[in-house]
């Protein structure tokens, strides 16, 4: 890296299910020039229409374990009872930062904690709902999850909301344009 290259800012985004992370991330991908959005690595098979390197990096369980063993993962989790693994590979994030690009990583609470402990200069953002009632309404209004799944997600949301003080920035998503602008400001150091 040359002396005049500035390290790109790393922003970690977390928040409960149905808070609007996907909507905000989609807008940021279109609105922020040169943004690198971290692509997760997974051991699951690609779904129809998914592209390796765009949707996920698809690897075998052994390749994933090798990445962990070599310190090449910023965070990871066993999912579906350990049948699959998913996580954030360090290489692409570090490369984008070294090239001066702002980097956005969307992860869960545990992932945010892990990455922040490894990269202390990371900016952490918790995307919060305007109220608990709004979050419940958004989650149940989707109509895509069973009552059991909704109950589990709401319990997880309570834990996540209780931890929001761990984040450097808490942004209330009561208006998408305002939330996107606030995250852009953090990404670009405004």
Swiss-Prot record:
Residues that, per the record, bind ATP: 15-22
Reactions it catalyzes: GMP + ATP = GDP + ADP
Keyword Protein biosynthesis appears in the UniProt entry: no
One Pfam short name: Guanylate_kin
Locations listed in the record: Cytoplasm
SMART domains per UniProt: GuKc
PROSITE patterns associated with the record: GUANYLATE_KINASE_1, GUANYLATE_KINASE_2
Alphabetical list of InterPro entries matching this protein: GK/Ca_channel_bsu, Guanylate_kin-like_dom, Guanylate_kinase, Guanylate_kinase_CS, P-loop_NTPase
Record GO terms (molecular function): ATP binding; guanylate kinase activity
Keyword entries, A-Z: ATP-binding, Cytoplasm, Kinase, Nucleotide-binding, Transferase
Keyword Hydrolase: no
GO cellular component, one term: cytosol
Ranges where the Guanylate kinase-like domain occurs: 8-188
Enzyme nomenclature, EC number: 2.7.4.8
PANTHER family: GUANYLATE KINASE (PTHR23117:SF13), GUANYLATE KINASE-RELATED (PTHR23117)
Reported function: Essential for recycling GMP and indirectly, cGMP.
Family label: Belongs to the guanylate kinase family.
UniProt-recorded name of the protein: Guanylate kinase
Organism phylogeny: Bacteria, Bacillati, Actinomycetota, Actinomycetes, Mycobacteriales
């Amino acid at each position: 890296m040359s002396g005049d290259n500035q390290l790109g800012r790393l922003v970690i985004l977390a928040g409960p299910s149905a808070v609007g992370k996907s909507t905000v991330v989609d807008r940021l991908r279109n609105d922020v020039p040169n943004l690198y959005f971290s692509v997760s690595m997974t051991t699951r098979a690609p779904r129809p229409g998914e592209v390796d390197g765009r949707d996920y990096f698809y690897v075998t369980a052994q390749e994933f374990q090798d990445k962990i063993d070599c310190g090449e993962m910023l965070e990871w989790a066993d999912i579906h009872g350990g049948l699959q693994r998913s996580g954030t590979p360090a290489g692409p994030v570090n490369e984008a930062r070294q090239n001066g690009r702002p980097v956005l990583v969307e992860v869960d609470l545990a992932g945010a904690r892990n990455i922040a402990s490894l990269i202390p200069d990371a900016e952490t953002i918790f995307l919060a709902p305007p109220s608990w009632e709004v979050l419940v309404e958004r989650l149940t209004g989707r109509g895509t999850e069973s009552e059991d799944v909704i109950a589990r997600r709401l319990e997880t949301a309570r834990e996540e909301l209780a931890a929001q003080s761990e984040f450097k920035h808490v942004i209330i998503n009561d208006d998408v344009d305002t939330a996107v602008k606030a995250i852009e400001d953090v990404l670009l150091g405004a």
